[in-house]
């Protein structure tokens, strides 16, 4: 992944004007004006679709568990795009408010953990699980809480460790999903996970690839959209309509 990032180094090309130089591992990259605008737009665009999509799941809910899961997932999905947009807007237009920007950056990273947990909630709550696998319903929230505590104490200090935490948080609950008796939607989940993994190349490429963080945002949106489709189709769509969709 990181070898590919080194190959895609645009610092000595005509596109270098769209990005700033790389910074040491312990410092935060400062985007150009172009990149700031792209960072805001690439997540702001998805706020309304995420609200509409979450509302759709709520209205398709047939029981309390489906309603609760729709709320949890919807809050995680909308929260991700809203918090990211607010942080990048403040970072761009109000960068002199250092403490506010720093706090929002921490919240932005914390929300990712809860977004991952919320993305698994419908699968863990609405699908049949084994006696041991059912513990993952609450374990994902413990993992999200641990990740939040880590960000609070070690924000931007050990970036590779932070990235590893996101990867573990993203893949560990998937082991339970794969073991479910009903595996409908697995391919969509794997496709969404692939979008996130490919996006990590750009997540670690600020200063090498112009608009790297904005491209990462797009991969996040594609991954989230794929996972939303799987949740809508296999967990909320009435069985009669599922048959029509699959044809």
From Swiss-Prot:
Residues 61-66, 125-133, 181-182, 232-247 are lumenal. Its main location: Golgi. Keywords: Golgi apparatus, Membrane, Receptor, Transmembrane, Transmembrane helix. The chain crosses the membrane at residues 40-60, 67-87, 104-124, 134-154, 160-180, 183-203, 211-231. GO terms for cellular component: Golgi membrane; perinuclear region of cytoplasm. GO terms for molecular function: pore-forming activity; protein kinase activity. GO terms for biological process: positive regulation of neuron differentiation; positive regulation of Ras protein signal transduction; regulation of protein localization. InterPro entries: AdipoR/HlyIII-related, Hy-lIII. It comes from the Eukaryota. Residues 1-39, 88-103, 155-159, 204-210 are cytoplasmic. It is found in: Golgi apparatus membrane. It is a multi-pass membrane protein. It holds the Pfam family HlyIII. Belongs to the ADIPOR family. This is Monocyte to macrophage differentiation factor 2. It comes from Mus musculus (Mouse).
């Amino acid at each position: 992944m990181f070898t590919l990032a080194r190959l895609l180094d645009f610092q000595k090309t005509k596109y270098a004007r769209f990005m700033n130089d790389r910074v040491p591992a312990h410092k935060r990259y400062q985007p150009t004006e172009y990149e700031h605008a792209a960072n805001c737009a690439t997540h702001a665009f998805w706020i309304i679709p995420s609200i509409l999509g979450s509302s759709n799941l709520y209205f398709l809910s047939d029981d309390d568990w489906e309603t609760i899961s729709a709320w949890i997932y919807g809050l995680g999905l909308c929260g991700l795009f809203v918090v990211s947009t607010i942080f990048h807007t403040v970072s761009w237009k109000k960068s002199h408010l250092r403490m506010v920007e720093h706090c929002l950056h921490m919240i932005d990273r914390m929300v990712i953990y809860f977004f991952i947990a919320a993305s698994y909630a419908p699968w863990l709550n609405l699908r049949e699980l084994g006696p041991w696998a059912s513990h993952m319903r609450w374990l994902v929230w413990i993992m999200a809480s641990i990740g939040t505590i880590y960000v609070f104490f070690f924000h931007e200090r050990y970036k590779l460790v932070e990235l590893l935490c996101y990867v573990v948080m993203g893949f560990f609950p998937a082991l339970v999903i794969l073991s479910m008796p009903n595996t409908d939607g697995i391919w969509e989940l794997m496709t969404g996970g692939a979008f996130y993994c490919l996006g990590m190349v750009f997540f670690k490429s600020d200063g090498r690839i112009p608009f790297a963080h904005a491209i990462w945002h797009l991969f996040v949106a594609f991954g989230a959209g794929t996972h939303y489709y799987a949740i809508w189709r296999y967990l909320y769509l009435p069985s009669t309509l599922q048959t029509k969709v699959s044809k």
